[in-house]
Amino acid sequence: NKIAASSDYDNYKMLKQTARERGVKFLFETNVGAGLPIISTISDLRGSGDRVLKIEAVLSGTLNYVFNTLSADIPLSRAVHLAQENGYSEPDPRIDLSGKDVIRKLVILARESGYRVNVEDVESNLFIPQALFDGSLDNFWAHLPELDAQFEAERQRLACENKRWRFVAEWADGKGRVGLREISQGHPLYDLEGSNNILLLTTERYHEYPMLIQGYGAGADVT
């Protein structure tokens, strides 16, 4: 029901209203962060009178796995293959690489935080050329290795600067954006391992030190 919860805003409100009218629960906790208590925590905070001001998160276990797997011996194309082989990505990994899944998750979190937002309102920056998304899946696999050298050169540069790639979803000042960011050492997102997810929640109460929720974010066992 991730698609339903991130569909047109009026449809999302209708789903929740219908559930209330019929006395049933509309549960979708695992839509974001697998088994992590993210949606319920936001609901509890708002229920207590708090207000969400900013969301900063890594919400794709697949993409985090890919960028954590990159090395001198494992180029981008191989890392994407490994994500698929290990069950982290969709059968068509372009769904993950496009960031569309992360956009849906951010929309859900923003809505649960009390904001009116639709998928098309979120700014997205692709790190894979659009041409690889437009063709067939076979075409994607055939041309993905063409990006390996570029990503390896950038990976080496980041390593020298003590930075790491993270695909970050952010909601701030009433606007949403997702994209690949260079994260410096010392930032909470820097040491995120494997396919883990992390969320930093800035609220009126948790303002100076945002609330942090972190843990496994992909895989059938936790979803």
List PLM regions with ranges.
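Short, basic, helix/turn surface patches
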Residues: 24-36, 54-60, 119-127
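Substrate-binding/catalytic subdomain of NAD(P)-dependent oxidoreductase enzymes
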Residues: 69-70, 78-191, 196
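Rossmann-fold NAD(P)-binding glycine/threonine-rich loop
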Residues: 2-29, 34-43
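Catalytic, metal-anchored helix/loop core of enzyme active sites in primary metabolism
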Residues: 54-59, 64-67, 82, 173-223
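A short glycine/serine-rich beta->alpha loop
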Residues: 25-28, 51-52, 91-93, 210-217
